[in-house]
Amino acid sequence: ILLNSFIYFGFGYGIFNSNTKLDTYLGLFTLFNAVIHFVVLFFIKSKKLADSTLFYSTLGMVFTFITIAIPIQLDGSWVTLLWIAQGTILFWIGKTKNIPIYEKISLPILGLSFLSLLEDWSFYHYVNNLDIHAFWNINFLTGILAILGYGFVVYLSRKHAETEENQKFSPFNAIKSFYLPALLVLTAYLTFRNEIAYYFNYWLENSSLKGKEISEIDDYSLYNYDINVFKNIYLIAYSLVFFGGLALLNFHKFKNKVLGISAIVIGLLTLLSAQTFGLEELGELRYAYINGGSNEYFDVNFNYILVRYLLWGSVAFALWAIFKNTKFIIENTKFHIFLEMVIHISILNFLSNELVTWMDIAGYQDIFKLGLSILWSVYSLLLVSLGIYKKKKYLRISALVLFGVTLAKLFLYDISNLSTISKTVVLIVLGLLLLIISFLYNKFKDKIGDETKH
């Protein structure tokens, strides 16, 4: 029966597609196939002429032809929206009427709608950036409707998961519990990320100097490419806020372990990106601010420096949200220690970058290496103090490691380029810090000893 259905459809498709007068009706022909199978299905059901296998096979053919008819007859966002509507309605019927087959059919259709949405977004890479207005385009509307559709499906899934039947473990339920939230989270993240990118692409296109009476300008200088650097920083900041917010939402409302761990892992990867690629981009803007931007025709202002605080604020928020979520989701003490060390590394990274930035702006580029050595030494002292106060041995060990790295950097890299007076000042400062650390260890040795025994 199934083979006959596809053979009939294949011959019909070939006839319609080869005739220029009929090819516009391909979608209707496909929908007609769905109607025929629905009539057969109704007849089988009313007369009870076959077993459940034939019934569900015919039902599957009905939805298959409906699903195929949509992209054949329509294009663009309409395909995505109709697949979302079809999948959502099927899932709703399956859940509310307790018809599991509808629920199972809906999942691949929802997956197709997501792939169609990705295709819609990819098409916009070939459109003139001036034709796309951020947060005011068909892609954004489609994304919002997709979020609402997937959100409704996730809501239904969570609402009905409390019944005893659905609490039983099965591969389908296990896949569904991850698959549906993943669709929702990815769609929400990518929808707003794309709009931020569209905004900066529009700004870049508007910066064009084409048609302006400027002599001796090459193709590269036609655009203000510093805008791309701003875009990268804003996208990293958005990612940090999004996944930090997801971790916080999970902590306060959902308390889902899989979602929590996913938010933590992706958040940590984004933090790594912020403190490597993000810092590199901040360095590009700092250089542009000091040296006049990508070329002389574009304005350079203090926003080139201030944008760094958007990134660092996002880093701080993500760290705070991940830390709160981790205390609830992950009971492993070693991971808590790891996360605390990530926080201290981030703080030290921020302070070091601030020091380099402002010394560079002030014109003290020659001594920022020395400034970093002093900063790291002071921070190691703070870590020792905090480790003693909080009775955390790993903080004290980390402080000593940091101090050792600072000494190695000083003697192998910094001190050779310093004058005699500068060398004397640095060695005195480091000596004082060593004395303070030794004093703290001696003063609180009983407290440290009690901690070791414990």
Language model regions located:
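Alpha-helical transmembrane segments of multi-pass membrane proteins
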Residues: 1-454
